[in-house]
């Protein structure tokens, strides 16, 4: 047995329409198994995975749900890796929303499962999927039942000030029902913020940065002296930036108009705002940013959609400079779009030249495909592209908690 196959963590991320998994060593950061199931509930659900350098891809079927996909992963992938699995010391589960009670990563027990269930109203597309993964792993691997750790996206925001997390509605709605800003993507924001502190050679506790996680779901966070003081996602992951299928910010009266004048039910409106808006709604064609990158200069609907995306993002960046105590060390771009679409970085920072941003075109164009680095001129406020690794962050947090027990 390879000695490196010790101290392994299984990381499971059950999303709304996908499942990602990985087995890695949190100390040497080496991944031994990784993969994903994409396009759940659609006509063609497929799985791709890589184990010890060998790549695989299979079609699972049509209209596959989370349980079906997890059973396939367990029976067709995990069962073939007995040497790896017998060296697992724990399982880390990404959970989007911890609700009002959970402030940090924690060992999963019946009480934590109930808290995640109770918080599902705040993350209706994500928490139920997270719970399916948790329950199946505990059921299928009873020897690890006391070594399942929940790592929450909302934990990163637990120290935000009231000025950021309260909405201007009757205060009792917060005290009685927990209606407030919670944020999301906290695992990613926290990871790239710590990477940025190393790249800037600054103590994390003195770091003032703005982090932009841009993907199918997008969010932005302001970090002042190492503490997140504001973020764009709110009670749910619907608020904030323009996203793939989510609207982001809008006038709440739009909901009343849709309901009262268009006779749309609340459930129908919720579906529209979560699954049929954003880039998909603006273009009427796609939510995939690769499409918009190709068509930006030749299709009006693509240019319109991208320009609105960039307009919203640049406004947030400018606004967040106001909560950083008069010092901005850097802006960080991460996530699938943030890491791989130079066009977006160019368009956003061309709108922010007043704040001292000067993009280096060559660095911007070459920093893609997993590369991290500075993309600005020497006399500019720094902008970094940093590749996120939520799986590694979850594995390291899981390992830390297990070793504290």
From Swiss-Prot:
One GO CC term on file: cytosol
Entry GO MF terms: acetate kinase activity; ATP binding; magnesium ion binding
Alphabetized HAMAP family for the sequence: Acetate_kinase
PANTHER family registered for this protein in UniProt: ACETATE KINASE
Origin species: Buchnera aphidicola subsp. Acyrthosiphon pisum (strain APS)
Designated name of the protein: Acetate kinase
Cofactor stoichiometry and binding remark: Mg(2+). Can also accept Mn(2+).
This protein's UniProt keywords: ATP-binding, Cytoplasm, Kinase, Magnesium, Metal-binding, Nucleotide-binding, Transferase
Residues marked Transition state stabilizer (site): 185, 246
Active site positions, chain numbering: 153
Amino acids binding ATP: 20, 213-217, 288-290, 336-340
Pfam families attached to this UniProt entry: Acetate_kinase
Positions contributing to substrate binding: 94
């Amino acid at each position: 047995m390879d000695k490196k196959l010790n101290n392994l963590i299984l990381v499971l991320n059950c999303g709304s329409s996908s499942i990602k998994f990985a087995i890695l060593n949190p100390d040497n950061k080496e991944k031994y198994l990784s993969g994903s199931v994409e396009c759940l509930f659609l006509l063609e659900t497929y799985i791709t995975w890589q184990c010890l350098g060998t790549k695989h891809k299979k079609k699972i079927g049509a209209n596959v749900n989370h349980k079906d996909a997890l059973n396939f992963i367990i029976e067709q992938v995990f069962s073939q890796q007995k040497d790896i699995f017998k060296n697992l010391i724990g399982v880390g589960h990404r959970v989007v929303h911890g609700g009002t009670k959970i402030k940090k990563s924690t060992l999963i027990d019946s009480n934590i499962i109930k808290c995640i269930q109770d918080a599902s109203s705040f993350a209706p597309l994500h928490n139920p999927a997270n719970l399916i993964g948790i329950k199946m792993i505990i059921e299928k691997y009873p020897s690890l039942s006391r070594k399942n750790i929940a790592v929450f996206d909302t934990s990163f925001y637990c120290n935000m000030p009231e000025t950021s997390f309260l909405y201007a509605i009757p205060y009792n709605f917060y005290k009685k029902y927990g209606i407030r800003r919670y944020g999301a993507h906290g695992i990613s924001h926290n990871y790239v913020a710590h990477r940025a502190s190393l790249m800037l050679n600054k103590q994390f506790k003195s770091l003032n940065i703005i982090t932009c996680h841009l993907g199918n779901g997008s969010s932005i966070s302001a970090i002042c002296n190492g503490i997140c003081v504001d973020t764009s996602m709110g009670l749910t992951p619907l608020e904030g930036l323009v996203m793939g299928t989510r609207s982001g910010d809008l006038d709440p009266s739009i909901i009343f108009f849709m309901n009262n004048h268009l006779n749309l039910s609340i459930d129908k409106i919720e579906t529209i705002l979560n699954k049929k808006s954003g880039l998909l709604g603006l273009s009427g064609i796609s939510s995939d940013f690769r499409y918009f990158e190709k068509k930006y200069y030749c299709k009006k609907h693509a240019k319109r959609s991208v320009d609105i995306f960039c307009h919203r993002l640049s406004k947030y960046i400018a606004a967040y400079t106001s909560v950083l105590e008069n010092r901005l060390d850097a802006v960080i771009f991460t996530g699938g779009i943030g890491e791989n679409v130079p066009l977006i970085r160019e368009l956003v920072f061309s709108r922010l030249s007043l704040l001292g941003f000067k993009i280096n075109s060559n660095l911007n164009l070459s920093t893609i495909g997993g590369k991290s680095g500075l993309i600005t001129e020497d006399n500019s406020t720094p902008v970094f592209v940093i590749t996120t690794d939520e799986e590694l962050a979850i594995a390291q947090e899981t390992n830390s908690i297990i070793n504290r027990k």
